[in-house]
């Protein structure tokens, strides 16, 4: 890492995060002038107004220009989506437990006096709340399931970066003008053209700023860098990039512009090493220094950490530590089924090894064709201990997409949005994170509904749980579809849609069904606790008959608080096998109930004509979802977290080593979980030391691939180090750890999430 990159890193974290009202004020000012116009045009005009008037900056030593806010890592508001939580939490932002932001007194007053009065009763949240039935609201309130994306842009998508980079904005504008001439009454085409042209002008603003800064710059090298930034910007405003620097610059400009349009998380990067390779090769051919090209890439990696999402306090518990979702996948397969690993795949990992920040959230695609050098480079990067890269298995994901009607060529081109959500770049609007389903809460409801049932059998209880899962999935789908319609009617994204196939051919926004593939992705959470609980309950109550069903319920209601309750808890934990240890009796319960969940979810369609798709990953939601569930027969205390990850065993219950964990997860139908899965594994640093440790990790990754698991990620850190960081956070500001599908700075996480990571079983190989 060069001195420049180190200074750029340091500059991001010198000051506290702040909230900027600039986007919200500009958006509102435009919106007030467009009453009565079609929503999609109002949205486009508001975004164009932002692009014209927002303050821009080029920071010291930057090689990649483009900042969403002048101050680093500032949060922005979108009151047009939901003004209510912002008003409620204005005073809490600087002191809340997770994801703190400073906000000035002046901005508090401006929000209360200007922004909130305008958006009250005219936001997307008002529409969604007005459409939700009481039954759906009750299920959300008790956290049987959550409906996400009701207060901000949807995101969770990958635009067609090859189209942007290989054609350039000038050609795309010309194409959109032709569409407008052919269909002059089509509001989508009008909105998209307006924003493509506004994007060109926004980029030209940076060209003019760079030229102005160069005029007064006393340092000759920096002056030339600014002039090159200006030249690159002027070129990118009209033409397709010719160099790696230009390609990275246009790529980042579009990321920033799309942030202004929707203020959404997980506008992900796709297969970066594939579409950027021609530009990297062109620069090498032109005689560019490879070391400088790596510095360009590292500059871009640093920039990815400048964007953080302002979430509500409750949302920050579900998505703790700013999982921005700048996710990029490396390697994988070509459309012909050959290995896609290239020189840029290696360089992306080299650049990450130098930068070591939470973003981009790199992943590596493994398959039977992966070569040893790239597998070893991957293992070497994992061993650094930041949780990056995560691993995805082509041997599972490609068939999973084929099962959803995706073509073979498209399935081989898959990438990941957000944390682990599977998507086809440039062709999918997957609504990937629309809901989370609390499987353990459903079990708890069923247990209490059977209190006093003297004829209850274990099979009866299983049938009741399956039926209840089906019932609440119906309600979850109802709520998700209302949110889907809310985004269609209140928050279309015409600029983003212009980079998604087949929106241009259909002449409509992604929110209106314009994409080629239309899914709605929902997560089933708590399968490990559910299977552990049912296995122990069956053994204790129905097979051994040590307690009656009602007696066990009483122990659970008392939260194991009595001396007898403590003995029962010890027996539940120690005498009954747990998921994650390669024991069929309990693993098969997980497989059967998770399959039931998946098959129920996939029965339903969304308003865009697409299918609901199941996944199993938690982000950090296993903590808040566990807080609403009482004591359970796996020995969990009331309010204790659920198993992390999605498919991970419960904390401390995976006692037979990491290979046994792989075998347990392999018994689940990973192919059905086409919205993504998540498996966390923690290793001690000592077990991966030296060349031998590296080869053991590489062999473990090959076993993961052969066993046909979908996903795995790693923490490589000592619990003692993490405890020290809790005590002396000022000495560990750069410590990056894996949470669930993303990495974050350990000291920026709340204590409940920190404790969760510390308690995860540390394995040896």
Model regions: which residues?
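Conserved catalytic cores of very large enzyme subunits
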Residues: 2-189, 225-765
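Extended non-globular scaffold/tether segments
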Residues: 190-201
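Extended amphipathic alpha-helical scaffold segments
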Residues: 203-211, 273-277
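Small-side-chain structural scaffolding
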Residues: 207-210, 214, 230, 531
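A conserved hydrophobic secondary-structure block that centers on an alpha-helix together
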Residues: 214-217, 221
């Amino acid at each position: 890492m060069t001195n420049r990159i180190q200074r750029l890193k340091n500059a991001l974290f010198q000051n506290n995060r702040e909230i900027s009202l600039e986007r919200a004020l500009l958006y509102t000012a435009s919106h007030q002038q467009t009453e009565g116009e079609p929503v999609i045009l109002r949205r486009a005009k508001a975004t164009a107004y932002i692009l014209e008037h927002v303050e821009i900056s080029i920071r010291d030593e930057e090689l990649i220009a483009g900042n969403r806010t002048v101050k680093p890592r500032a949060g922005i508001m979108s009151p047009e989506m939901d003004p209510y939580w912002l008003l409620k939490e204005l005073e809490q932002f600087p002191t809340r437990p997770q994801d703190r932001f400073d906000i000035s007194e002046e901005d508090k007053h401006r929000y209360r006096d200007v922004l909130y009065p305008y958006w009250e009763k005219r936001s997307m949240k008002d529409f969604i709340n007005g459409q939700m039935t009481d039954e759906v609201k009750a299920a959300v309130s008790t956290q049987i399931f959550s409906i996400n994306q009701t207060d901000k842009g949807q995101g969770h998508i990958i635009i067609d970066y090859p189209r942007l980079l290989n054609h350039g904005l000038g050609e795309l504008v010309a194409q959109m003008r032709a569409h407008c001439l052919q269909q002059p009454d089509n509001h989508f085409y009008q909105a998209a053209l307006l924003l493509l042209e506004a994007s060109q002008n926004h980029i030209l603003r940076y060209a003019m700023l760079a030229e102005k800064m160069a005029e007064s710059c006393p340092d000759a090298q920096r002056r030339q860098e600014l002039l090159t930034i200006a030249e690159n910007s002027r070129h990118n405003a009209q033409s397709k990039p010719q160099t790696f620097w230009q390609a990275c610059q246009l790529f980042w400009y579009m990321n920033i512009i799309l942030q202004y349009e929707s203020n959404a998380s997980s506008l992900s990067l796709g297969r970066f090493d594939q579409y950027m390779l021609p530009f990297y090769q062109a620069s090498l051919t032109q005689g560019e220094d490879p070391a400088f090209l790596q510095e360009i890439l590292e500059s871009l990696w640093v920039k990815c950490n400048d964007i953080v999402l302002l979430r509500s306090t409750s949302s920050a518990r579900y998505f703790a530590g700013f999982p921005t979702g700048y996710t990029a996948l490396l390697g994988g397969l070509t459309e012909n089924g050959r290995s896609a690993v290239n020189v840029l795949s290696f360089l992306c990992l080299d650049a990450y090894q130098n930068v070591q920040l939470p973003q981009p959230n790199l992943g590596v695609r493994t398959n039977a064709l992966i070569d040893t050098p790239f597998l070893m480079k991957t293992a070497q990067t994992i061993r650094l201990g930041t949780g990056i890269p995560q691993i995805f298995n082509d041997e599972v994901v490609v068939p999973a997409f084929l099962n959803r009607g995706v073509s073979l060529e498209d399935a081989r081109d898959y990438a990941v949005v957000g944390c682990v959500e599977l998507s086809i770049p440039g062709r999918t609007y997957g609504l990937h994170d629309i809901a989370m389903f609390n499987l353990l809460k459903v079990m708890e409801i069923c247990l209490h509904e059977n209190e006093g049932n003297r004829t209850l059998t274990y099979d009866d209880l299983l049938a009741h749980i399956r039926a209840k899962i089906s019932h609440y999935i119906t309600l979850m789908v109802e709520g998700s579809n209302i949110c889907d319609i809310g985004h269609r009617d209140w928050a279309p994204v015409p600029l983003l849609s212009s980079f998604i196939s087949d929106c241009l051919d259909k002449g409509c926004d992604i929110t209106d069904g314009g994409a080629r593939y239309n899914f709605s992705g929902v997560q089933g959470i708590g399968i490990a606790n559910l299977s552990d609980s049912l296995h122990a309950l069956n053994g204790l109550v129905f097979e051994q008959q040590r307690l009656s069903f009602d007696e066990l319920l009483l122990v659970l209601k008392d939260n194991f608080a009595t001396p007898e309750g403590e003995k029962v808890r010890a027996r539940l934990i120690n005498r009954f096998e747990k998921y994650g240890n390669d024991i069929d009796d309990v693993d098969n319960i997980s497989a059967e109930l998770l399959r039931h969940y998946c098959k129920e979810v996939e029965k339903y369609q969304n308003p865009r004509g697409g299918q609901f798709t199941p996944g199993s990953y938690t982000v950090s939601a296993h903590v808040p979802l566990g807080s609403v569930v009482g004591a359970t027969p796996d020995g969990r205390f009331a309010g204790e977290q659920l198993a992390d990850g999605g498919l991970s065993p419960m904390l401390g219950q995976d006692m037979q080593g990491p290979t046994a964990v792989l075998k347990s997860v392999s018994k689940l139908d990973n192919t059905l979980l086409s919205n993504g899965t998540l498996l966390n594994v923690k290793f001690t640093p000592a077990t991966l030391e030296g060349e031998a440790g590296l080869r053991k990790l590489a062999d473990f990754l090959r076993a993961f691939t052969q066993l046909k698991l979908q996903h795995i990620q790693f923490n490589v850190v000592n619990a003692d180090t993490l405890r020290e960081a809790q005590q002396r956070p000022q000495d560990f500001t750069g410590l990056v750890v894996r949470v669930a599908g993303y990495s974050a700075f350990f000291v920026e996480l709340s204590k409940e999430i920190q404790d969760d990571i510390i308690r995860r079983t540390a394995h040896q190989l």
